[in-house]
């Protein structure tokens, strides 16, 4: 996902050459998109970042929305240091007088049971706003029961669990869930109902090492029994594949730029061997390497310059050449793993939607086109502070945003032509509205919740399917509203009647089944 500012910055950075590769977009037809019949068969979704506050609780275990912190004797909190964790991410030691603490997801009026292995010496407590909640410790067992009710999906305070760490037998395998939930269930049923029906799930936001641009290897990766899914490489591949299988969707993964070849190969083998028959996997290298706001683009540029790659398009061109080179390397590994099963693999190269020039450069570099199956961009219809200034809500909903839909999909058609030139599919790794106002958050909320957003999404999906006709992974499943509001729903389980974007998507699913 690119912010409005970063898109403008990059368009300026790449220079006029990128815009000369295609004719100027027309905004004609800004009001005729509603005439296109939408279909949901191509519509996927991006999952949102794992945290306790965005309105999405994917996992039954309530601990997996946060990371460990320590609390000193004065009550001050700080992040737990890596040296204080064991190899699986459980707190193994803290200074004297400190406690380990972990924020839990809030639940709506439920009894919760926490179970664990190890010795907490009777110190395990649940607190909300520094006050202990009513709780019961089961005699002779590592089990604590408490009751909690979240007033609303975005209404803190959230519960936290605290305990003393015994280095000789520290707490591990901590599991907190509703008392009536089965111990082995992985995913929250409300989350499953919210994500059900999408054809593709793009997991980039769950793969922590992608946007963090950190080095990962297979031996140091997270596993389902790890104590934290926010660090290292993020949510374990086992859980992402399990989710795709459970809801009947094709997974879309991003390989971290700094993952070694062994990690990439083992990841690919796990997917090959465990993804349900009939399902396909989409794979790309990192996320938005074209975007100068991200560390991965700057690394690609440094590497491209250091390798002495073609500099006829400047250092940015060297970054894109390095991206093409890296894409060939990673896709070569996946292709080898899926030898004989290539129909289950979709290899993706991504580019900026408004720059067909660079899409062409990437595909034409070396034999990159032969190493991929699809070109992807993110056809957002964006509105920033400058576009919104002085305009009424009616102006924005009735004129500005419909024109933006037409403009971005005109660019998408140019990208489709580039892909077709090389015999490749054209798809979208992200998409949807991209309203980002730094100075008028109340207006953002009005726009996102306006009933006319339903018609805009219906129009957008309809024209995408009419003019493009391939996969789009909308951004994103859930999320609250601030300077932006990308969530199709503000929280998992939000009634569709209150979520105009999701209502349009759900209706497209229903129409595709007719």
Residue ranges and their predicted role:
Residues 11-22:
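Bacterial N-terminal signal peptides
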Residues 25-285, 290-399, 405, 409-435, ...:
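Non-catalytic accessory regions flanking glycosidase/transglycosidase catalytic cores in CAZymes
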């Amino acid at each position: 996902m690119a912010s409005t500012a970063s898109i403008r910055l990059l368009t300026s950075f790449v220079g006029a050459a990128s815009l000369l590769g295609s004719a100027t977009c027309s905004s004609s037809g800004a009001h005729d998109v509603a005439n296109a019949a939408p279909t949901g068969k191509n519509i996927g979704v991006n999952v949102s970042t794992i945290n306790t506050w965005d309105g999405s609780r994917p996992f039954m275990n309530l601990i997996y929305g946060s990371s460990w912190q320590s609390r000193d004797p004065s009550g001050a909190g700080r992040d737990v240091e890596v040296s204080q964790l064991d190899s699986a991410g459980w707190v193994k030691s803290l200074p004297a007088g400190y406690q380990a603490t972990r924020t839990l997801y809030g639940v709506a009026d439920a009894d919760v049971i926490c179970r664990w292995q190890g010795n907490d010496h009777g110190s395990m407590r649940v607190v909300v706003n520094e006050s202990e909640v009513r709780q019961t410790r089961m005699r002779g067992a590592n089990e604590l029961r408490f009751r909690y009710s979240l007033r609303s999906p975005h209404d803190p305070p959230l519960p936290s669990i605290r305990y003393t760490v015994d280095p000789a037998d520290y707490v591990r395998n901590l599991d907190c869930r509703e008392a009536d939930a089965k111990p082995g269930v992985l995913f929250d049923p409300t989350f499953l109902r919210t994500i059900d029906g999408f054809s593709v799930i793009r997991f980039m936001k769950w793969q922590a090492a992608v946007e963090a641009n950190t080095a990962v290897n297979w031996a140091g990766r997270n596993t389902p029994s790890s104590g934290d899914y926010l660090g290292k490489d993020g949510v374990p591949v086992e859980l992402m594949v399990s989710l795709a299988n459970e809801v009947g969707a094709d997974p879309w993964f991003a390989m971290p730029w700094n993952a070694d070849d062994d990690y990439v190969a083992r990841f690919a083998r796990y997917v090959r061997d465990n993804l349900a028959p009939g399902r396909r996997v989409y794979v790309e290298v990192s996320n938005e390497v074209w975007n100068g706001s991200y560390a991965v683009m700057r690394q690609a540029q440094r590497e491209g310059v250091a390798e002495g790659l073609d500099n006829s398009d400047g250092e940015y061109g060297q970054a894109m050449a390095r991206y093409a080179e890296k894409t060939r390397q990673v896709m070569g590994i996946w292709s080898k793993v899926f030898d004989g099963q290539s129909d289950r693999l979709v290899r993706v190269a991504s580019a900026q939607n408004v720059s067909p020039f660079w899409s062409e450069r990437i595909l034409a570099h070396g034999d990159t086109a032969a190493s991929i199956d699809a070109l992807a961009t993110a056809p957002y219809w964006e509105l920033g502070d400058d576009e919104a200034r002085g305009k009424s809500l009616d102006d924005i909903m009735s004129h500005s945003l419909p024109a933006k839909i037409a403009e971005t999909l005109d660019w998408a058609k140019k990208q489709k032509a580039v892909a077709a030139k090389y015999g490749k599919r054209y798809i979208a790794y992200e998409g949807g509205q991209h309203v980002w106002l730094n100075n008028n958050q109340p207006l953002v909320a009005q726009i996102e919740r306006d009933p006319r957003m339903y018609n805009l999404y219906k129009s957008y999906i309809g024209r995408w399917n009419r003019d493009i006709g391939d996969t789009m992974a909308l951004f994103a499943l859930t999320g609250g509203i601030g300077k932006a509001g990308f969530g199709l729903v503000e929280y998992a389980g939000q009634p569709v009647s209150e979520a105009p974007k999701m209502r349009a998507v759900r209706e497209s699913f229903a129409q595709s089944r007719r």
